[in-house]
């Protein structure tokens, strides 16, 4: 399971564990900016890993330059690029490890483009010959929020890239005006 952050992973992990599905996590998020935010989210996943004794592989790569080069002048399509970048590597890793399938914690967030995530996951599954596990975890979003507070996990305020940070705070500022 691609883990975008500790908070979003909580409900999907609980749900899949309840179905007796073994989970191998993958931290791969070069889309998270700035570096201090990237580090806080990484440390939060590491904290969750210790508390819940999770099996997680880390691809610790801060990819600001690569991300910006890929999305410049295509900012409106950046989310699809971001999903593709992460789910492609997740599918490739799952196939290499001979796992039964792959999924992502992104499927829990009501703020993500759910249908696009599903489409990218299916495409990567076909490309790498490994099933993409689809489940709508969004009904557990608030459960995950409460659990993350109980566990004392860092709670981010925007999706990840500097564009989403700008949109979040710019919209908040506009709402005050």
Language-model features, listed with the residues they occupy:
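Nucleotide-activated chemistry modules centered on ATP-dependent adenylation/adenylyltransferase
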Residues: 1-177
């Amino acid at each position: 399971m691609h883990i975008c952050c500790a908070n979003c992973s909580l409900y999907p992990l609980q749900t899949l564990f309840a179905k007796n599905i073994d989970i191998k996590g993958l931290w791969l998020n070069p889309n998270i900016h700035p570096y201090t935010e990237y580090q806080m989210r990484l440390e939060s996943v590491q904290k969750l890993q210790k508390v819940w004794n999770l099996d997680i592989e880390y691809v610790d790569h801060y990819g600001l330059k690569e991300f910006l080069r890929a999305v410049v002048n295509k900012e409106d399509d950046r989310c699809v690029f971001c999903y593709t970048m992460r789910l492609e590597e997740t599918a490739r890793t799952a196939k290499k490890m001979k796992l039964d399938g792959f999924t992502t914690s992104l499927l829990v967030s009501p703020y993500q483009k759910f249908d696009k995530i599903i489409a990218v996951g299916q495409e990567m599954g076909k490309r790498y010959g490994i099933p993409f596990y689809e489940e709508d975890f969004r009904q557990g979003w608030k459960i995950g929020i409460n659990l993350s507070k109980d566990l004392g996990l860092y709670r981010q305020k925007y999706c990840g890239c500097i564009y989403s940070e700008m949109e979040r705070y710019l919209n908040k500022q506009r709402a005050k005006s």
